[in-house]
């Protein structure tokens, strides 16, 4: 297969075991793509080609494999909604539709290689087409969650210098309000059944677009995508990934952690605005020729998730720990998952108790993985490996992972320190390039020969890594990364608030939630405090993305601060996690 030869990173195409087709309840913890962890880590090597484009070198090669009959009749993409509607594409159909989309970007929108395209769409087929169209045209994809507010959209359009935005009816009005303030924005595409003034209607344009398009020959180190991520100070930062860092780097996830082959059907529940969707809804499964399954749910519903797992031949399932916590509260034993054989979790640490309950009710282990928007899989629990509940597992083949002290010294097993990835003398291919337009932040992540993840942990005597805490104050709630600065910025706009500090607080379902410690202005200290809490919560929901609002609020007289005036969030968080 040409893609395998050119990229020199994928092993021989795995032919599915026919037992998995004949017997729907076939399950095994034996890896499909490797013999054991040690051999996988030892044997893994990759040469990065000078030119690489995932659409041309992977997707189009799977199309060729389909045409020659070497890939079983498994869809490349399978989408369903709650109303019984389904969309199925082969790799050939995906290619044809994405080439039409690519022509719209280059011809109707006049976009050129390197131009930036913001895509804010829910889990609808056009989101996947937008991903592939950007690859084909060499334009830079910038995903955004559909929960963004007008203020969020303005900041992202301005800071990214996006020339085009693609969204739907829900967010188009917000875009229209801020568009005049975005000097680089000149094209707007809407996915809608209706026309809108000043917008190109993508559905109509697709009807007449040509599917003849020549894929841009991108260099492996060209910028492919920018992901916004929350931090503790300042607004969200832009993380740059290249055609190789995700396009090739995520082969590690697909082949080893997800253990996918071409007959698999992979369902990842992540929001389209996050890098996890690139991980498990685009690059990882399609690298392996597997089917990407998507279910459009307006909101998370555990019953719908279980029904979907039971109804469709999903073999690999990926979701956040919050989802598993909610799923096990149902009577899972009343469902039959005849095809499901592999379950993974990422985004935040998963409780051992949840893993135990899931195994008890389904017979399946949950294989936890650890990574960041900046990386591909850093550590993981892999099939064929002993699972230590609560552990992140062992380093993926992509990285050399160590625990460092503040001086950059590698610590022995059992000692807590900073989780770090070696980047010198040879920089790993699955790592981001830089924080866009933020060289000081990029430089701050380096310590000697290592990239510092910002997370604390330790390694045990068996080489398993254990997560302890985040070095920064980012809150992980239901799989969302929430920066305290964003919430505090919204809070301070309320007239009752003099100052505030936001930290994480434990929650049995979401893992952790946002808690705000608030110092009130004198005029509001006699107000009904419960009513005021509700008003503040509603204010935050309207000011920033709704998932960021503080589910817990505590009014205090003053915030603990250092001598230099910095809020001591660590003290507040420690108190919260100790006393709650």
Curated annotation (Swiss-Prot):
Main location: mitochondrion
Record PTM N6-acetyllysine, positions in chain: 151
Enzyme Commission code: 6.2.1.2, 6.2.1.17
Keywords associated with the record: Acetylation, ATP-binding, Fatty acid metabolism, Ligase, Lipid metabolism, Magnesium, Metal-binding, Mitochondrion, Nucleotide-binding, Transit peptide
Reaction(s) this enzyme catalyzes, per UniProt: a medium-chain fatty acid + ATP + CoA = a medium-chain fatty acyl-CoA + AMP + diphosphate; propanoate + ATP + CoA = propanoyl-CoA + AMP + diphosphate; butanoate + ATP + CoA = butanoyl-CoA + AMP + diphosphate; 2-methylpropanoate + ATP + CoA = 2-methylpropanoyl-CoA + AMP + diphosphate
Highest taxon above the source species: Eukaryota
Subcellular localization: Mitochondrion; Mitochondrion matrix
GO molecular function, one term: metal ion binding
Amino-acid positions noted as binding ATP in the UniProt annotation, renumbered to this chain: 229-237, 368-373, 455, 470, 566
Presence of keyword Hydrolase: no
Stored Pfam families: AMP-binding, AMP-binding_C
InterPro entries in alphabetical order: AMP-bd_C, AMP-bd_C_sf, AMP-binding_CS, AMP-dep_synth/lig_dom, ANL_N_sf, Mitochondrial_ACSM
Position of the signal peptide: none
UniProt transit peptide range: 1-21
Modified residues (N6-succinyllysine): 67, 100
Required co-factors: Mg(2+); Mn(2+)
Recorded GO CC terms: mitochondrial matrix; mitochondrion
BP term (GO), one: acyl-CoA metabolic process
Family: Belongs to the ATP-dependent AMP-binding enzyme family.
UniProt xrefs under PANTHER family: ACYL-COENZYME A SYNTHETASE, ACYL-COENZYME A SYNTHETASE ACSM3, MITOCHONDRIAL
Function, in words: Catalyzes the activation of fatty acids by CoA to produce an acyl-CoA, the first step in fatty acid metabolism. Capable of activating medium-chain fatty acids with a preference for isobutyrate among fatty acids with 2-6 carbon atoms.
Name of the featured protein: Acyl-coenzyme A synthetase ACSM3, mitochondrial
Annotated source species: Rattus norvegicus (Rat)
